[in-house]
Amino acid sequence: MKQRDLVKELEKAGFEFARHGGNHDIYKRGDDEEKIPRHREINERLAKAILRKWGL
């Protein structure tokens, strides 16, 4: 899955970009936080796990 597609899904769920980490971008929704690897392509299993974690 492309990183931008995963980010779009998180933003639809109310997450907003918070900051850049070392190799990850951090998105927040209230007290919830998710770290997204800064790569063009993200492993499908990882992307699905992130979406499943937030019920998306």
Task: List the model feature ranges, each with a label.
Residues 1-20, 28-56:
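Basic nucleic-acid-binding interfaces
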Residues 25:
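A cross-family detector of function-defining hotspots
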